[in-house]
Amino acid sequence: MEKSDQSKIAIVTGGASGIGLAIAEKFVKNNITTIVIGRNEEKLKSAKTKLGALCETIAFDLNDLSAIPELIKKLVEKYSRIDILVNNAGINLKKEFTEVTDEDFEKIIHTNVQSIFTISREVVKNMIVNKSGSIVNISSMASQYGLPKVIAYSASKGAIEAMTRAMAVELSPKGIRVNCIAPGFIATDMSAKALNNEPERKNKVLSRTPMGELGAPSTIGDAAMFLAGSEAAYITGVVLPVDGGNSIG
């Protein structure tokens, strides 16, 4: 049986802005102590101000794989346990297929896949001791649709979904659930600004979205809260589209 959501400890990577911040905000509103990991200290400071006393922010580059075990060790020592891990941190690169270098591809895979594997492995060690835990990975509709100029990003998000299913099967007997959210077009400050500067592209995006609008970041926060919390106690290995109907086909 899962403990009350209100007594849980959560980590949200890439949680200082956009979707990650919306997830952290939802957790804090549900009285979950939330550790936000990010690289931009100014954004982390702003997130701390917004989220308040139930939030701890940590400036950390997840590409530093060798430092992740020590980071998680210190957090476990401080909080005794980690109940929830949201793997949201990731980067994108928009380039023509033939312009993507090996270094470009490796950087995307390293950040979006390898770092998720490493931090998940370290957090799971503690979850196994506690015989409970929930991991929510963030992928993208790009993993399921052929979108142009994002070959490395699409490949990385497909890998995340495959890892989600493999982890769910292996970790379920240990009391750990692993699920994934595949966002569609979400109106973060960055994406909304980009689309507003490209009216033709924005119209194309909206026309292919059955609900006819961009999703609010809070919709991903709601989905993450559901999958991470006790209401989803019998759900694991799921990739949940939150995309305004894009996945209908």
Sequence positions of predicted segments:
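Short C-terminal tail/terminal secondary-structure segment
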Residues: 4, 145, 225, 236-249
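Active-site helix of classical SDR
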Residues: 120, 156, 164
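Alpha-helical segment proximal to the catalytic Tyr-Lys
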Residues: 125, 169-173, 233
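Substrate-binding pocket helix/loop in short-chain dehydrogenase/reductase
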Residues: 96-97, 101-109, 205
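C-terminal helical subdomain
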Residues: 180, 203-231, 235, 244
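Conserved glycine-rich cofactor-binding loop
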Residues: 16-17
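Residue(s) in the substrate-gating loop at a strand-loop-helix junction
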Residues: 140
